[in-house]
Amino acid sequence: MNKVLEEISKIGILPVVVLEDAKDAKPLAHALCAGGLPCAEVTFRTAAAKESIAIMRKEFPEMLVGAGTVLTVEQVDEALEAGAQFIISPGFDEDVVKHCIEKNVPVTPGTCTPSDVQKCYRLGLDVVKFFPAEAAGGLKMIKSISAPYTQMKFIPTGGINANNMKDYLEYDRILAIGGSWMVKGDIIKSGDFDKVEALTRQAVEKLREVR
């Protein structure tokens, strides 16, 4: 397994971040690191994503920072220019996956069916995103899908929160969970990064109960 993905596995929780303004990147990264989660998936849902990744990588070199919601090869290149260390997409796009492989950057495409996982398996991937996790059947579905793919690990994202996170993390085929409850948009917009840090600490405490 790729070293970056191994580090994400050790951390256990991947905060999924949507930043409307790059000025929030530095204080948000500080709050996550201080709370015990030195990693972030910065989604390409906004124009601030590329600059935000660059700021986090520069100001917090110890942090693992990747790009999420990557839909095109062009966005892969933008993310890598900013310093992204991994790529995550909501679904499987063969061009995106192959481009990441060529660039030697870890990529975890979104999956929610055996066919999706099979496509990733055939391209040599050993970690995939399961999205939208809760809406697509949750942990029960992951257990069913994972049975034929004994080497595949999953990063479930979507609908995961402080109340159900432990259920996912207890399953040994879960590499890490993706979540946004500690980095919700309204908290970031209000500038309450102390709350981000507090919610992050609480998440880490729950994580330590099972890992």
PLM-predicted stretches and their roles:
Residues L37-V42, L80-A82, K103, T113, ...:
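Glycine/Thr-rich beta-alpha phosphate-binding loop at enzyme active sites
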Residues F86, P90-V96, K129-L139, R173-K195:
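Glycine-rich phosphate-binding active-site loops on the catalytic face of alpha/beta enzymes
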Residues K140-I155:
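Shared catalytic-loop signature of beta/alpha-barrel
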